[in-house]
């Protein structure tokens, strides 16, 4: 099992690494931050790496050996947490899944409605990759609640070559086919044409809404 330093959503090694990384931040926090301050302070990843590259006496009388033992213990604890979370079969430890890294967009009314209505309002879950330390930041939690939901790549030489991504759709009406029509593209890190000229727009027109004043 080889980890290629990519948090691919279809990767089991990526799932193991993220469990280790999360455990690492917890353990370094427990080691370095006084107990009375642990609700207020956390050690960031850059500082964590610096502490591991130049270990001090907090790791024990032999800091290098203590650091190595600390990392091995952290890995074992991370794997144990994954086993408890996803079961003993390592094939089930794939990173991108509903029980691990995913994107579920919860409607503001989601908690107040029936399960049937909630299924209409919420969008997802869709498997995701990455985390808060990767390009295309997808956040540090299991459910992606941070990161870009909209991106646009504008070609100022030819505006009709502009590309975009957005989520979850183009309508706020859950009964509309456009309510979540862009979500899968976004979750797959794919883009769509964002046409500019009238001819191009009308060539892919879904519907026209005409609003006429009553008087």
Name each model-derived stretch.
Residues 1-215:
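C-terminal/peripheral segments of proteins
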């Amino acid at each position: 099992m080889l980890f290629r330093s990519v948090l691919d959503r279809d990767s089991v090694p990526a799932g193991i690494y993220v469990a280790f990384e999360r455990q690492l931040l917890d353990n370094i926090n427990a080691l370095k931050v006084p107990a009375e301050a642990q609700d207020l302070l956390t050690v960031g990843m850059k500082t964590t790496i610096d502490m591991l590259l130049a270990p001090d006496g907090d790791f024990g009388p032999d800091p290098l050996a203590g650091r190595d033992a600390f990392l091995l213990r952290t890995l074992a604890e991370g794997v144990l947490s994954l086993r408890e979370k996803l079961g003993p079969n390592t094939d089930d430890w794939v990173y991108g899944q509903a029980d691990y890294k995913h994107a579920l967009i919860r409607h503001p009314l989601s908690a107040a409605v029936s399960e049937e209505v909630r299924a209409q309002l919420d969008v997802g879950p869709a498997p995701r990759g990455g985390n808060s330390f990767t390009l295309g930041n997808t956040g540090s939690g299991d459910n992606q609640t941070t990161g870009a939901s909209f991106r646009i790549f504008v070609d100022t030489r030819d505006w009709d070559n502009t590309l975009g991504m957005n989520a979850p759709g183009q309508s706020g009406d859950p009964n509309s086919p456009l309510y979540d029509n862009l979500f899968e593209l976004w979750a797959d890190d794919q883009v769509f044409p964002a046409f500019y000229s009238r001819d191009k727009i009308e060539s892919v027109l879904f519907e026209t809404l005409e609003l006429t004043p009553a008087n």
